[in-house]
Structures are given as structure tokens and as C-alpha cells.
From Swiss-Prot:
The active site is at 44 (charge relay system), 47 (charge relay system). It catalyses: L-threonine + NAD(+) = (2S)-2-amino-3-oxobutanoate + NADH + H(+). It comes from Rhizobium etli (strain CIAT 652). NAD(+) binds at residues 179, 199, 204, 266-268, 290-291. InterPro entries: ADH-like_C, ADH-like_N, ADH_Zn_CS, GroES-like_sf, L-Threonine_3-DHase, NAD(P)-bd_dom_sf, PKS_ER, Zn_alcohol_dh. The gene is tdh. Belongs to the zinc-containing alcohol dehydrogenase family. This is L-threonine 3-dehydrogenase. Catalyzes the NAD(+)-dependent oxidation of L-threonine to 2-amino-3-ketobutyrate. It is found in: Cytoplasm. The record marks 152 as: Important for catalytic activity for the proton relay mechanism but does not participate directly in the coordination of zinc atom. PANTHER family: L-THREONINE 3-DEHYDROGENASE (PTHR43401:SF2). GO terms for cellular component: cytoplasm. Its main location: cytoplasm.
């Protein structure tokens, strides 16, 4: 195996990513080197491409980025015992310290020292990625490489949707991006009574309909209260999944929640936006922030959803060769795409 590889690198502090030859990552005793077959583009990668304020404060330059992937094990460290070369895998992109109180209590997803693959350390937009053995997730034979490549965002959706009991509940999802749509699908499959999803992007609304979401609302044209009445809702929503990061959507969600309602918040909102805290208080709402996936319970659950028949393939709207990565990022930046999966093989 060559000691060099192709990779997408944030090599300059400006807009874009660049395909370069870089060294293959070194494998430590507890590490696993994975040959990447499929990579998916995340919204985080778009922020890095755009070199916005968050990216400028967060991303070291130069660095290989990317964190949504699937592949097969190419090499294992001397102390690795659970995996073997050739095994099909994906990986948890949040690397935790294992030493803080939350980690020691089995709550690794709450680690205050979390490092993100492709954000704080070299990522998976390369022919190889190296992660700790503890972050490797085997992929069953009946799950394809491209579906495994979107398990990271699907895990965000599963973690958010399953934060609260859904059986018999009326659920509002704000934001019909890929994660919002997947969250709505999980809610529907988990026994929710009514599932309503809102957005203002026509392409994303059409994609939600294509995936089988029953009640799809264009918030720029339709009044949510009228939709609730039309579908037989006489009280507010029991559970809210905020996936948009849009202040107007979050405010509308709070307004439409039933007393005692529960809201899981994944969307990253602009700093300093206002909500009516009196509604939160007097409706006795429960707000829960979500970041990433529960390690590793969410992975077991999402594998079970897919093996149980949940078809995520329509959420992948663009399949491209890695040399055409600019086309993939153009599609993502336009807002007129679902997931974009890039083929390294």
C-alpha cells in the first residue's frame, strides 16, 4: 500500500476544498485504518467549504475534512482485538475522552472534551481515514455502503426523534432537510399519531412527500393552525423536533405545542434570536438540546430501523464520483438536494 492518498483538504483559509495528495494516516496501537468507499456531504462540510464565521473559528488549516463515510478495514493497530482486515464498517465521528464524569458514567455523547472527525482532527474525505477501535461500527451484510455512509446524519435524526415517547403522539417537525425528513420517518415508524413537517423550500417539501410523510406544510404559504384543524387536531402538538435552525420555525413550534409538550432541538439557530419564554413557562414545555448520537445506543437503533424495512435510499438524490466533488458541493449549497454520496472506488 502506498504511503500517500488522495484527499479533499481545507488547505487555504478561503472558500472551497482542494483535492491533494497527502500522507496516509499513521495507525496507532488502538486505531483502525479504514479504506473509504463512500463519503456523504454534511451541512457542516458546506460550512467548511463556505469558510463562514463558524468554520474560521473552528477548523484548523490545512486539514482533511469530512465525517460521513463507509468502507472496509485496511489495517488494524497492534492492540486491536475486535475487528479484522476486510470487515465492512462505518464509524462514530465524535471521539470522546473516556475520562470525564459523563464518559465514566457511560454517557459518552455528553463528553465535554469531544473531538469531531473532519472538524477538530483529520476526516474521512480521503482514500483512508483512521479512527480509534472504540469508534468503529460494523455494517451488516444486508445494509449497503451508501446507506451506511449516511448513518451519521440518520443517527442525528434517530437520536432527536427518540428523545421522547412517540406512541400515539402528534409530532411537529420543523425543517425538511434530509435529517428532518429522516426524523419524521422515524416518528411515523415509531407509532406517532400525526406527523407534520414544515419548510419553505419547494424541493425539500417535494422530497418529504416522495418519502411518504403524510402532512407536508409549506410554511411560506400555509397557516399551520389551519392545517392542524384540517387533519383533526383539537389540541397542540405533543412532541416537536426542531431541525431547521430557523428562528421563525422555532417560534411557530412553541406557539403550536400542547401544554406539557416536549421539544428536541437539533437545528443550530442564529445567536441571540428571541422566543416568547412566557409560552415556554406557562405551557410547561420541556426543551432538550441534541448533539450527535448516543454512543452507541443510537447506532443499534438505526441499524434496526433499516433492517426492519425503513428505506432511506430516496433521501440520496445525488450519487457522484469523487473527482466530481465540486458538483456535489454545488448541489448541497443550492439547497435543492437531499443527501449527496461520493464514490471513492
Amino acid at each position: 500500500m502506498s504511503n500517500m492518498m488522495k484527499a479533499l483538504v481545507k488547505s487555504k483559509a478561503e472558500v472551497g476544498l482542494w483535492m491533494e495528495d497527502v500522507p496516509v494516516p499513521e495507525v496507532g496501537p488502538n486505531d483502525v485504518l479504514i479504506r473509504v468507499k463512500k463519503s456523504a456531504i454534511c451541512g457542516t462540510d458546506v460550512h467548511i467549504w463556505n469558510w463562514d464565521q463558524w468554520a474560521q473559528k473552528t477548523i484548523p488549516v490545512p486539514m482533511v475534512v469530512g465525517h460521513e463515510f463507509s468502507g472496509e478495514i485496511a489495517e488494524i493497530g497492534s492492540a486491536v482485538t475486535r475487528y479484522h482486515v476486510g470487515e465492512r464498517v462505518s464509524g462514530e465521528g465524535h471521539i470522546v475522552c473516556g475520562k470525564c464524569r459523563n464518559c465514566r458514567a457511560g454517557r459518552g455523547h455528553l463528553c465535554r472534551n469531544t473531538l469531531g472527525v473532519g472538524v477538530n482532527r483529520p476526516g474521512s474525505f480521503g482514500e483512508f481515514v483512521c479512527i480509534p477501535e472504540s469508534n468503529v461500527v460494523p455494517i451488516p451484510d444486508d445494509i449497503s455502503d451508501e446507506i451506511a455512509a449516511i448513518f451519521d446524519p440518520f443517527g442525528n435524526a434517530v437520536h432527536t426523534a427518540l428523545s421522547f415517547d412517540l406512541v400515539g403522539e402528534d409530532v411537529l417537525v420543523t425543517g425538511a432537510g434530509p435529517i428532518g425528513i429522516m426524523g419524521a420517518l422515524v416518528a411515523k415508524r415509531s407509532g406517532a399519531r400525526k406527523v407534520v413537517i414544515t419548510d419553505i423550500n419547494p424541493h425539500r417539501l417535494d422530497l418529504a412527500r416522495k418519502l411518504g410523510i403524510d402532512h407536508v406544510v409549506d410554511a411560506s404559504k400555509e397557516n399551520l393552525a389551519d392545517v392542524m384543524k384540517a387533519i383533526g387536531m383539537t389540541e397542540g402538538f405533543d412532541v416537536g423536533l426542531e431541525m431547521s435552525g430557523a428562528a421563525p420555525a422555532f417560534r411557530d413550534m412553541i406557539d403550536k405545542m400542547n401544554n406539557g409538550g416536549k421539544i428536541a432541538i437539533l437545528g443550530i439557530a442564529p445567536a441571540g434570536f428571541e422566543i416568547d419564554w412566557n409560552k415556554v413557562i406557562f405551557k410547561m414545555l420541556n426543551l432538550k438540546g441534541i448533539y450527535g448520537r448516543e454512543m452507541f445506543e443510537t447506532w443499534y437503533k438505526m441499524i434496526a430501523f433499516v433492517q426492519g424495512g425503513l428505506d432511506l435510499s430516496p433521501i440520496i438524490t445525488h450519487r457522484i464520483k469523487i473527482d466530481d466533488f465540486r458538483d456535489g458541493f454545488e448541489a448541497m449549497r443550492s439547497g435543492n438536494s437531499g443527501k449527496v454520496v461520493m464514490d471513492w472506488m
